[in-house]
Amino acid sequence: GPDSDNDKLVHVKSDGTITILGSGFTNSGIASSDGSVKLESDDWASTYGTVTVNNDGQITLANGSGGNASGRITVLDFAGNETTVSDYTIFVDNTKAVSTNISVGVVKQGATAVLTGTGFKNGDAESTITIGGQNAGATTFTYTVDSGTQITITGGSGDINDGEIVVTDPAGNVSTTNKKLTVDNTKPSVSSVATETI
């Protein structure tokens, strides 16, 4: 029967793909029309997307609009031989993260703002964020995904003016939050002090 050698956790969204590596994918007559790849008991091709046998050692799974699910992948050949990737769990995730609130709208370097919502974390995999199109860094901001419902953002050394927070979940679903944050490290400037003699 076919063998596979993947041993990691993978997240996939509606336009994402997964590649399975191994052997015996063609010489055993494996074909997607035979329901040859399953996520737990669900046939991948009919439930989630398409299966493409690229060669004897590679299969590509494309995820369509199927619902959210998680489980281990099983590969089945025409003879009925099957192999389950026992240490490999697939998360099919077509649900975007949702942001409901930002605790403050303006922070300076070292100050924090808390973004709350849902879908920020899936198992050990965490979402990433950008603010005003900028990635995290010492001069922009840093962040910690505290839980699936909370992200703590810390202001960096530079400035970001009214930047929209965009959350990308572990599967790659991108969510514009309609929540904005300004990082402001510019001190007010006093040019003169006028006095008046009475």
Predicted regions: what they are:
Residues 2, 30, 97, 188-189:
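Proline-centered linker/hinge motifs at extracellular inter-domain junctions
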Residues 7-15, 104-110, 196-198:
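Short, solvent-exposed loop/linker segments at the N-terminal edge
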Residues 16-27, 110-124:
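A short glycine/threonine-centered beta-strand motif
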Residues 26-47, 119-139:
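Short, surface-exposed alpha-helix to beta-strand junction/turn motifs within ectodomains of secreted
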Residues 61-69, 154-162:
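Surface-exposed, short loops/turns at beta-strand junctions within beta-sandwich domains
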Residues 75-77, 167-169:
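Conserved structural position at the C-terminal beta-strand
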Residues 82-83, 174-176:
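A structural signal for beta-strand boundary/capping segments at domain termini and interdomain linkers
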Residues 86-96, 179-188, 196:
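Flexible, low-complexity linkers/stalks enriched in Thr/Pro that connect modular domains
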